[in-house]
A protein has these predicted regions:
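Canonical Rossmann dinucleotide-binding motif of NAD(H)/NADP(H)-dependent dehydrogenases/reductases
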Residues: 3-34
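Short C-terminal tail/terminal secondary-structure segment
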Residues: 3-5, 244-262
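Substrate-binding pocket helix/loop in short-chain dehydrogenase/reductase
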Residues: 98-99, 103-111, 209, 213
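Active-site loop-to-helix junction immediately N-terminal to the catalytic Tyr of the SDR YXXXK motif
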Residues: 102, 148-157, 169, 197, ...
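Active-site helix of classical SDR
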Residues: 122, 159, 167
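Alpha-helical segment proximal to the catalytic Tyr-Lys
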Residues: 127, 172-176, 241
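A conserved structural motif in NAD(P)-dependent oxidoreductases
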Residues: 204-205, 217-228
Length: 262
């Protein structure tokens, strides 16, 4: 039996990048899914996974920062498959700017997607999980904010660090009702979002910016979204049945080196 067979997962930000990687691994392991994204390309991702893995998938095109949208997405998963066992709260944004130049609109954009989006997703699925006697929530945080930070990332770092606190609070609140809540803390992965950041950092040679990142990682490369998907699959499965409130770093060792040495 595949590790996610019989599980129903709601995955946000599932059209491209990390979300598509997570959805691909979940399909490989037999999960039924509701894929959520603001991008209509989520339909193409679903079609691809149905054809490749025979996965049972419904989609919802909507905005995670809109509470009603997330309630509708969770309801769609429930109506299609009978329950919601796992929520992968992956949707997120990152825009770079010097702090003194960062607009209120840019700050609020990060808060709306990175914090409110996860909040809304959790509030949408938890009632179903309580009704069915448990579930697993996996939140995509980051090493940025809670462990490390770089100039220009104030809004992103602030919002991703907040998700660690949310993870721990929800884990404590729902542990005795069999809902596990964990978060991944990702370094850099080769995704459209990172490629966009590279363009913002070095418009003339974005590939050079990506290679500069890889040089600073002990493993000398960025993560593949499928590797992140494997972590999300473990946390969503019964293999992680005694794991809650955890922060799992998946960064190729990038946060390990001392910044200064003799």
């Amino acid at each position: 039996m595949k590790k996610l067979e019989g599980k129903v997962a709601l995955i946000t930000g599932a059209a491209v990048g990390l979300g598509k990687g997570i959805a691909t691994v979940y399909a490989k392991y037999g999960a039924k899914m509701c894929l959520v994204d603001l991008l209509p390309e989520v339909e193409e991702t679903a079609k691809e996974l149905r054809e490749t893995y025979g996965a049972q998938i419904v989609t919802y095109v909507g905005d995670v920062s809109n509470k009603d949208h997330m309630k509708e997405a969770a309801k769609k998963a429930k109506e299609a498959f009978g329950e919601v066992n796992v929520a992968c709260c992956n949707a997120g944004v990152c825009r770079l700017a010097p702090f003194e130049e960062m607009s209120d609109e840019m700050r609020d954009f990060h808060i709306d997607v990175n914090i409110k989006g996860v909040w809304n997703s959790c509030q949408a699925v938890i009632p179903y999980m309580l009704e069915q006697g448990g579930g697993s929530i996996v939140i995509a945080s980051s090493v940025t904010g809670d462990i490390v930070a770089d100039a220009g990332e104030a809004a992103y770092a602030m919002t991703k660090a907040a998700l660690v606190g949310l993870t721990k609070c929800l884990a404590v609140e729902y542990a005795d009702r069999h809902i596990r809540v964990n978060c991944s803390q990702l370094g850099y992965a080769r995704t459209p979002m990172v490629e966009k950041m590279a363009i913002e950092s070095n418009p003339d040679n974005p590939e050079s910016a990506i290679q500069d990142i890889a040089v600073g990682v002990p493993m000398k490369r960025l993560a593949d979204p499928l590797e992140v998907g494997e972590l999300f699959a473990f946390l969503g499965s019964d293999e992680a049945s005694y794991l809650t409130g955890s922060q799992i770093v998946i960064d190729g060792g990038s946060t390990l080196p001392e910044t200064m040495s003799i």
